[in-house]
Structures are given as C-alpha cells and as structure tokens.
C-alpha cells in the first residue's frame, strides 16, 4: 500500500528564509521611517510615497511603536497630521498597551493631544498597568493636556492596578494646580486605593498641608482608616512628623483618640518615631495619655523608651499613672532602667513610681537596671524595695561586679541564700563571672560552702548544678 503524502514541514528552510527577509526589510524600513520622523514631515511623506506603511511596527527597543506613537511621543505635530491623513490607526498601542494619546499626554504635547482626540483617539484607553492618558498628564503636571482630556470624556475617577486615581497621583506629588483641576471636574474625593489610601492620605503622608486643607473643603474624610494597618490620616501625619499637618487635622476635628490595628494612637506613633515636636502638639491638643495599645503599652511607656524627659514630665502632669504596666508587666520605671534614662527614672520616682513592682518574669526596676548596665541607675535603685541580700544574689548571677560592690556597701549579707540555698558566690561561679567571684571571696565567704545537692562553688564553676 502506498503511503499518504507527507505534509511539508512548516519550518522548512525556504519559508524560514522568506520570514527572515521580510523581518529584515521591515526593520530597515522602520529605521528609515524613525530617522525621517525625527527630521521632518516632508521626509516622512517621501517614505510613505515609496510604499512604507504608516502602521509599521517598531522592533527591539521601540517596543512595538507605530510611526504615529513615535511622532506623538517626540512632539512632531506636522508628522502626526500627515500620518493621520495617510491612514495611521489612531488607537494602536505599543507592547505596553500605550497609545499615541498616552505618549502625547505623558510628554505634555497639548496640540497633538487635541488633534488625536478630534480624530477619534480614545481618552480612556489603558496601558497594561491600567493607566490612562489623564493619569500620565497628571503625574507630569501637564495642565493644558489634562484640560483637553477632561473636556473630551476622560474618566476622572479611573483606578489603575493599585487602585490609584489621577487625584491620588496628583496628591502624591503635592501638585495643587492639577488637584484643583481634577476636583473641579468632579473627581471623587474619598475613593480609596486597594490598600485603603485616599487622596487626602497621600497628601498627609507627604506633608502637603495646602492639599489637605483643599481636600477637607471638598469633603475629604479626615478620620477614614486605611485597610492594612487601620491607621487614620492623623496617625500617619504624627508618625511622619508633619507637625503643621497634624495641627491642621486637629483643627479639622481629626480624632486624637482613634487607634490603628495595633491599638496605637497618634501620640504613640509620634513618640515611637521620635517626632517630639509633633508629640508635644498632640499632648497640648488633648490626646489621651492613659490609652494602652494591644500590648498594654501606654503613652508614658513610649515617652520613657524614647528618652524625652520634657515629654515624660508633660504626660505626668496630665495625671498619667507612673506605675502602669504593659502586658509584660513592665512599668515606666523598669523601662527607664533598661534604657539607661537616669533623669527620667528620678522624675518617675518623685512622681510616686513604685520600686517594688515585679514584671511577669519576676524582675524589679533594679534588676532591669542591672541588665541595662547603667551604674548610676543601679545606685539610684539600690536603696529601698526588696532586701539587699536578694539584690546581691541577682547582681552576682549577672556578673555585675559594680552592683555587687554597691550592695555589699549597703550591708547586704554576702552569705544570704535563695530558695536553692545558693549564695551570691555560688551563682557567680556557676555563670563564670571571675571578677565577681574574686570580689566575693574578699568578704571571707567559704569557698567550700554547700548549697542544695551539696554543690560547692568550685563544683558549680566546673559545670555542675
């Protein structure tokens, strides 16, 4: 039996050569046309008369440009007119989905924008990133181009892939004139992006006070929360340290007690970002001082950690609780001790802060001072509170030789024992604190004394216990 005839291979050499020659010809024609567009409309006309297509596609670095797109981008008005007359497709786009109108709008070529829309260019054609010509004109502050687009049907509230509108993009840039134009053309003021940011948020984040004021006059919501962190404009402004914007928002009735998803209020945001001028304004503006976030941290805790004595004083004068605890059981005094803030610790003690409170891990403020390594704070907190012998054992276990010496000078019994019947020497030996061991031996402690399980300091130093 005879076999059926084989189909010719689609990738045969003759066809491949033909495709290559066509491709090479188009590339050569595009190069000639591109050079002509940069030269003059007459030069372009000569090539079109020679049969080169007005809808030829650019290759490689020209990302699928058409002659009309390229002429619109560089602002060659006469060439744009010619190409339209010779049949150029007005709404063709490049490989990024950008039309001739998109490129003209991006570069502020107003006369070309006007010509294109009169000849049917779609003002709402979107790029692959879902951006419109109006967005590009706004970003680049091309007011005349914006006006033409808006009068010819551009959607003022179109949102890109991130949910941003032209109004938001103008707000990001702080461009008052562009924003005014968009608002006068009916831009929706409280539209939110995918993460919940409005145009007012954008203005606040970048410290554009005049825009914030303008948005408020047009009905911008000053207490609206964004979606991810649930922060308000006031929290964002406080964290960024935009004090004039914070003052403005307060005058517009922004709520200083509104908190974000972590329970943080604007004042805490300012303190944690060390925006002290802003924090002072918020305190004077009536911010609550005893509010706790979801970790139990309050304003006094935050001001203490930030190390600002003046703000701690202001907060205490507002009747903040000097012995308040966070979820870890830490008081402001403990945090001052940990962070090495001596003057703040002194102020807290004068305001009635207790030395006796222990955190969830059984540590007092003095123990926090030991771990923080600040000798002056160790001295300050050494007197009062728990027995000196208990403090001596803790200091020895941490190897804080100066603290051990301080407690010995306060008549702590060097041979006092804890619940395991271990003394300070045993703890220092177990943890390898040689200098502390040497100091304690000078007190006459017996190196062969035993604790629980009959462990001696020497055994503990060798790895026992």
Regions found by a protein language model. Give the residues of each.
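Core solenoid repeat modules with strong leucine/isoleucine-rich periodicity
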Residues: 194-197, 205-206, 228-231, 235-240, ...
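Start-of-repeat signature of ankyrin repeats
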Residues: 29, 61-64, 97, 130, ...
């Amino acid at each position: 039996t005879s076999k059926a005839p084989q189909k010719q291979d689609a990738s045969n050499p003759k066809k491949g050569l033909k495709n290559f020659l066509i491709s090479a010809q188009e590339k050569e024609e595009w190069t000639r046309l591109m050079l002509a567009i940069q030269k003059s409309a007459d030069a372009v006309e000569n090539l079109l008369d020679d049969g080169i297509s007005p809808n030829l596609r650019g290759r490689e670095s020209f990302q699928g440009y058409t002659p009309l797109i390229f002429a619109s981008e560089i602002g060659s008005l006469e060439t744009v007119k010619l190409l339209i007359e010779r049949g150029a497709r007005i709404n063709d786009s490049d490989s990024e989905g950008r039309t001739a109108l998109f490129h003209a709008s991006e570069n502020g070529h107003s006369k070309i924008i006007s010509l294109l829309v009169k000849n049917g260019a779609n003002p709402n054609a979107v790029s692959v990133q879902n951006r419109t010509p109006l967005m590009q004109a706004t970003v680049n502050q091309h007011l005349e181009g914006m006006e033409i687009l808006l009068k010819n049907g551009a959607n003022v509230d179109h949102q890109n892939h991130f949910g941003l509108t032209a109004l938001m993009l103008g707000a990001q840039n702080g461009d008052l004139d562009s924003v005014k134009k968009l608002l006068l053309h009916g831009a929706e003021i409280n539209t939110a992006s995918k993460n919940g940011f409005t145009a007012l948020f954008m203005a606040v984040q970048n410290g554009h006070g005049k825009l914030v004021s303008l948005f408020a006059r047009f009905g911008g919501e000053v207490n609206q929360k964004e979606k991810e962190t649930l922060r308000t404009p006031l929290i964002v402004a406080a964290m960024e340290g935009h004090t004039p914007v914070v003052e403005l928002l307060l005058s517009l009735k922004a709520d200083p007690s509104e908190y974000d998803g972590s329970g943080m209020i604007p004042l805490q945001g300012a303190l944690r970002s060390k925006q002290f001028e802003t924090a002072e304004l918020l305190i004077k503006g009536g911010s609550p001082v005893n509010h706790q976030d979801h970790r139990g941290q309050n304003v006094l805790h935050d001001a203490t950690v930030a190390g600002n004595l003046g703000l701690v004083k202001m907060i205490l004068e507002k009747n903040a609780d000097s012995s308040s605890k966070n979820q870890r059981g830490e008081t402001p005094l403990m945090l001052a001790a940990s962070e090495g803030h001596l003057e703040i610790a002194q102020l807290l003690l004068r305001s009635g802060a207790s030395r006796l409170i222990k955190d969830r891990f059984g540590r007092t403020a003095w123990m926090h001072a030991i771990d923080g390594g600040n000798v002056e704070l160790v001295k300050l907190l050494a007197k009062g509170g728990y027995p000196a012998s208990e403090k001596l054992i803790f200091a020895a276990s941490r190897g804080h030789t100066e603290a051990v010496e301080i407690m010995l000078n306060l008549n702590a019994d060097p041979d006092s024992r804890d619940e395991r019947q271990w003394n300070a020497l045993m703890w220092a030996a177990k943890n390898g604190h040689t200098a502390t061991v040497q100091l304690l031996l000078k007190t006459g402690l017996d190196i062969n004394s035993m604790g629980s399980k009959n462990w001696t300091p020497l055994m503990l130093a060798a790895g026992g216990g």
